[in-house]
């Protein structure tokens, strides 16, 4: 059983509908927020990975069972792990295009505890970008995005946190 649709009711009374797609191995390969008043169909959505009929579409690229990349409308995040046999993240390479149309690349580093949970994220110069505290089973207790630009989606090893649904 896989999550193919999530309806999120906001405090202001509005509703967002997110749809998810998976490959034959059960790995999530896409997620996107539907434009207002569209319906999700398991057979028709969202096979068009070019972003048609979607707002905020994300694609996922895998190397075996390792999440290799997330491709967002505003750029791409590539993940590097400590070892090919480990799910402990080491670094994140962010490629994006700035407002002037120039390509930019940032490298950020994960600082994990003894069981591979990211506790901090720093930039290439060692400046703190993000830090988090967790409950016993990997649920995020609290986080601080120091710069407001850090993106850290990992929890326990090989667990991806979907911010839209909280899963």
Give each language-model segment a name.
Residues 14, 54, 73-75, 103-104, ...:
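Residues that act as N-cap/strand-start positions at coil-to-secondary-structure junctions
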Residues 5-11, 30-37, 69-74, 91-97, ...:
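Beta-turn initiation residues at beta-strand->coil junctions
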Residues 23, 70-72, 83, 123, ...:
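Acidic/polar residues at beta-strand termini and the immediately following turn/coil
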Residues 1-2, 17-27, 40-51, 57-66, ...:
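Aromatic-rich beta-strand edge motifs centered on tyrosine
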Residues 10, 85, 158-160:
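Short, flexible loop/turn elements at secondary-structure junctions
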Residues 64-69, 88, 152-155:
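Short, hydrophobic/aromatic-rich segments at coil-to-beta transitions
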Residues 39-40, 75-79, 98-102:
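Short, surface-exposed beta-strand/loop "edge" segments at domain boundaries and coil↔beta transitions
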Residues 51, 92, 99-167:
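A motif-centric feature for acidic-aromatic and gly/ser/thr-rich catalytic loops and repeats
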